[in-house]
Amino acid sequence: MNLGDGLKLETELLDGKTKLILSPYEHKSKISVKMGNKAKIAKCPLRTKTGHILKSTQDTCIGSEKLLQKKTVGSETSQAKGEKNGMTFSSTKDLCKQCIDKDCLHIQKEISPATPNMQKTRNTVNTSLVGKQKPHKKHITAENMKSNLVCLTQEQLQQILMTVNQGNRSLSLTENGKEAKSQYSLHLNSISNQPKDENIMGLFKKTEMVSSVPAENKSVLNEHQETSKQCEQKIAIENEWKPADIFSTLGERERDRSLLEAKKAQWRKELDEQVALKKKEKEVSEKWNDPWKKSESDKIIWEKHQILDQSRETVLLEHAFSAVKQELQRKWIEELNKQIEDDRQRKIEEKIIYSKGEEHDRWAMHFDSLKSYPGSQSQLSSRSTHKQPEYFCVSPDTQELADVSSVCTPTTGSQVEPSEEEHIAKPIKDVVMANSKKTNFLRSMTALLDPAQIEERDRRRQKQLEHQKAITAQVEEKCRKKQLEEEQRKKEEQEEELRLAQEREEMQKQYEEDILKQKQKEEIMTLKTNELFQTMQRAQELAQRLKQEQRIRELAQKGHDTSRLIKNLGVDTIQIEYNASNISNSRHDSDEVSGKMNTYMNSTTSPKKDTGVQTDDLNIGIFTNAESHCGSLMERDITNCSSPEISAELIGQFSTKKNKQELTQDKGASLEKENNRCNDQCNQFTRIDKQTKHMKKYPKRPDWNINKPPKRYIPASEKYPKQLQKQREEKEVRRQMELLHLVEKNNPGHLSQNRGISPEIFHSSHQETESKFRWHLVKKEEEPLNIHSFSKERSPSSPVPAVKNRTQQTQNTLHLPLKNSSYERENLISGGNQTELSSGISESSHFIPYVRTNEIYYLDPDAPLSGPSTQDPQYQNSQDCGQERQLFDSDCVRDPLLNPNMVKNRDRQQAILKGLSELRQGLLQKQKELESSLLPLAENQEENFGSSF
């Protein structure tokens, strides 16, 4: 709590001049005052503390009054400096008159509307002085911020002097200046309840004030008491008159004087109690902190004397320490003189600076805010930063208002010239110059912005610029990233397009290569098919010529004229010989073609290798089988001939060739089984050869599931145990032989038709048949039954020339693309049945299937031959044929299809015939489709078999 709190001042016009008087005051409790001070300090922490330096005008006064004035003003000045108010008091003429009359002590505040330079100078003086005295943080009280003016009553002044005396007394116990300073600061803190940033130099000044007049101390206190009473009475009278100035409303709620006096008395009493209590607490703390200074009894006695008679103790202690006080006073005076000299130098420099057209720079800066004026801007900044409180002096005589103020030294009473104070603004100028380099922009032509607002606007503008720069940088970064991504995407697209183009080119090349390979395959297959067809055609022509020769011989034996036939045959024999040579040549050519095909198939890669499909080498013996197929067809056509001699010779040739094949197969059978089929053996050996060649050529093992070593196909019949398999094979052979004998027995004219056949030829043909059956051990049982029964039933049918030729052609074309097993079956049928029957069977005994045709042949079964027969077996044969024809005729008479006279229901017969004709047309269409589709199927089969190499 500050000692000056609770007092407010008012201004009144007395005798045409402005005076300061105490205003009525409403008492507040100590706690509320303390809390109010704290709240006010918290609310206004940034306001600068400025002090007012009032001009002192000395008048003629009595010596005693001048001494009283010195003491009063000096004590007040020291207290003001100690509390950092920075107030300098001076007495005027009215103050001197009131002191003479012992009326009241007034403190005049004369504020002149001086230039801002003078205001700034005063601010700087106070700041520099306080800063030199103690470099601690400034303490700003709420009352100083509110009024910056203090008026002390006589009682308050007495309390201050007592406190100073107590501080001097405690100082006597110490031995050096440092302990004295600490004791003063501790006492002052305990009394005023303020923080430790109290001005110690102010205490020294108080000590100097009191020590200068030790003898007049008591008289001064008495005078103070009397003047305080008279001042209270005078203020009570003056408060009844309310002037009509601008400060007339201050303290309006505190007009009641009686309440104010009571509250003041109570406040003084509480303050005394508080001072005594704080003093006791201070002594107790000193006792515990430094017990060697005093004894306990001395402390108790010292406290009692302090409470009873403080003034007497103060006088005694001041005599003891007058030497120390004088030394401190001398140091203080030297320091103060030094400060005054510095202020004088600063003032001279400031005059030079401010004389350079201040107003011109100010208005130039006002109207052109884009230019920076260092001097004027620093002045503006200092003026705006250090504003004076808005207290105006309302005086009719403006000439009396002083433009300059002076610093009063209380001890010496010397006055300082007004020019000395202007030097203090120099450091402020230096500080402000650092902040004057920014370009300030004003709102309008007539309004000057506050520097804080200008800095705020600059800071916002800088932040906005930085934000815009950051946004621009982000946008540029995004654009750059987007551009890089676009370039990367375009690059990837170009690479993808190049890759796709390369893939398309590769696919196109592969497609062209595949087409070329396919064309080559088709050409080779077409060439092979043509060769085979030509070979078959030549064999057929050769068989036809041989048949004609046999017929000529038969006719010649019967006595017919055969010159015409021989003539035609003579032309054809050359062709026959040529065709025979062509047959041998075609065989060699077919061998060469097959070799070429094999090499081509081995050289070309199979698509199945790429797909990883496991395939067996099933097409190894295709071309050799095709060659054997040609031979089998030739054999079939030759054995179908009616001449027993030629057929026997050809059969002998083919049988010897097949026996050679059997020998080679028997050599290979030592590795496998003896009774396997010939084709399986051939295929097996060719596969083994291919495997060995492949392994020699490619020693490295291929990858998984690609071109695996082929496995031989083992039928289910070969998976039996060896003993059981052998028994099954024997049963199969036995059954085949029994079926063959049954077929022979069922032919009634078989045994009687042995004319001119040597037993060797028949035996050889029979051996050939048995060898064929031995090669076909794993055939089904039902096939030979059906085939032989069918051939047995239809064998005696009469031949029709056109139908015979057509059926032979269709059979030849149909049997071309089939597998080797089908040809072996046909060889079995033709070789088994017809070789035995061909010894004595005539031309009418050929098997001709029944086919409905548009051609009608009226064949008389009883019509005689062109010449009489010369051999008895022939007559027997004709008799047997006649019996068969009679039986057939009797069947035809009974059959309604063959004998239309037997049919009674004609409509039903017509419907049946119509359905049969439709069925025949459908079958013919199906036959044509099969003929047209079998040739491509054969080519596809050849291609599939060839692709596995």
Swiss-Prot record:
Signal peptide: none annotated. One of its GO terms (biological process) is regulation of protein localization to cilium. It is found in: Cytoplasm, Cytoskeleton, Microtubule organizing center, Centrosome; Cytoplasm, Cytoskeleton, Microtubule organizing center, Centrosome, Centriolar satellite; Cell projection, Cilium; Cytoplasm, Cytoskeleton, Cilium basal body. It comes from the Eukaryota. Its main location: cytoplasm. Keywords: Cell cycle, Cell division, Cell projection, Cilium, Cilium biogenesis/degradation, Coiled coil, Cytoplasm, Cytoskeleton, Disulfide bond, Microtubule, Phosphoprotein. It holds the Pfam family CCDC66. GO terms for cellular component: axoneme; centriolar satellite; centrosome; ciliary basal body; cilium; microtubule; midbody; photoreceptor inner segment. The keyword Phosphoprotein applies. The keyword Cell division applies. The modification Phosphoserine is found at residues 369, 606. GO terms for molecular function: microtubule binding; protein homodimerization activity. The modification Phosphothreonine is found at residues 115, 121. Residues 474-558 form a coiled coil. Residues 691-714, 789-809 are annotated as: Disordered. InterPro entries: CCD66, CCDC66_dom. Residues 570-949 are annotated as: Mediates localization to cilia, centrosomes and spindle microtubules and the interaction with PCM1, CEP290, CEP104 and CSPP1. Homodimer; disulfide-linked. Interacts with CEP290. Interacts with PCM1. Interacts with ARMC9, TOGARAM1, CSPP1 and CEP104. Interacts with CDK5RAP2, CEP152, CEP192, TBG1 and PRC1. Microtubule-binding protein required for ciliogenesis. May function in ciliogenesis by mediating the transport of proteins like BBS4 to the cilium, but also through the organization of the centriolar satellites. Required for the assembly of signaling-competent cilia with proper structure and length. Mediates this function in part by regulating transition zone assembly and basal body recruitment of the IFT-B complex. Cooperates with the ciliopathy proteins CSPP1 and CEP104 during cilium length regulation. Plays two important roles during cell division. This is Coiled-coil domain-containing protein 66. The gene is CCDC66.
